[in-house]
Amino acid sequence: MSNVKRLFVQKIFTDKEVSNLEGTWIDKSHIKLPLVKEDTDVYYNDNGIYKLLLKFRKNVISDDLIDIGWQSYKDLAKPSRGRGASAGPINSSGLYWSKRDLVDTKKWSTGYMIKGKKSKMKVNNQVASNPVGFYESSNNFSKLPCRLTHFTRCNFKKYNEGLPFIQRIDELFQELIPNAHMRQLERANLTNNFKIPNTSFSTVTINRNFRTALHRDGGDFKGGFGNLTVIERGKYHGGYTVFPQFGIGIDLRNNDFVAMDVHKWHSNTKLYETEEDKEFNSTLKSEFKDNPDIGTAGIYEKYTRLSFVCYLREKIIKCDNDNPVQSFLTSSTKRK
């Protein structure tokens, strides 16, 4: 770790200016500094005090663990219309929305007509993104208790088989940012029946070929830190993680890890194939059985970029810790 670079960056947008870009696509023109591809720590100037923005490490997750993660979780990033600003501006001419009569469309959310009536809720572009692990109680559209997420409960064997991969991410978190890890672990242990075993995480969001628009993460423990990695299949370019307020971008690839402040505005650049990439990807056997008529963004490409965002839910602390994990396998989706 002695060859780790240290970068000290300044704001090139005010907080107000960058917030005005929420929900928009960010391209590589917002990367003003050399793209981070090697071991690097980045600090930003916050009114004269330098604070940690991210720590990037190259090739720190073994191929064996990558394979475990792929086999366990590749099918768990299911279509979602609830990703908010990160799903980007509503694409009314795209395959998914062109089949629907939209109403009250504003930026990244829209309503639509169902049998002549306006939908009761507004939704976002459909992307492949779902959480595994645990969630606190919610009452958005129906009252749900603290629970295993639906896709965890339905794929509990695969979830458990992939734990060594998730646990390696937590090890890197502990190694790189020990104080934040300690705070998060102590918090997670207060409701240990709602945490992923031998980690400081309650939840992992899995995304497939999801280019995020500019957003800040919400719902995670504010005293912790964001932890990300990717698993790749095939060849592609782009997909850089960009913090436009600081002009910094990182190229997070297979085997890499980044701990980053997910409460700072961030986004991904477009994923794309070169001609060489296309030729290589044309030889790949299909791993998925997606219906191309549905129009979920990004998932019909031959290449795959699975991203994993590991965190502790802020409100999981309010859950009743008396329930053992096995009880959630039969009751986690029952309404109360």
Predicted regions and their residues:
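Contiguous, well-ordered alpha-helical segments that form the cores/surfaces of helical PPI scaffolds
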Residues: 223-232, 256-259
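Conserved metal-binding segment of the jelly-roll/cupin
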Residues: 250-265
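Catalytic or ion-translocation cores adjacent to nucleophile or general acid/base/metal-coordination motifs
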Residues: 244, 262-266, 277-280
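Fe(II)/2-oxoglutarate oxygenase catalytic core
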Residues: 1-224, 228, 250, 272-278, ...
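A short beta-strand-loop-beta hairpin characteristic of the jelly-roll/cupin
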Residues: 231-253
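Short, well-ordered beta-strand elements within core beta-sheets of diverse protein domains
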Residues: 284-285
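Short Gly/Pro-enriched loop/turn and capping motifs at secondary-structure junctions
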Residues: 236, 265-267, 314-315
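Short helix/loop capping segments that flank catalytic or ligand/cofactor-binding pockets
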Residues: 239, 268-269, 319-320
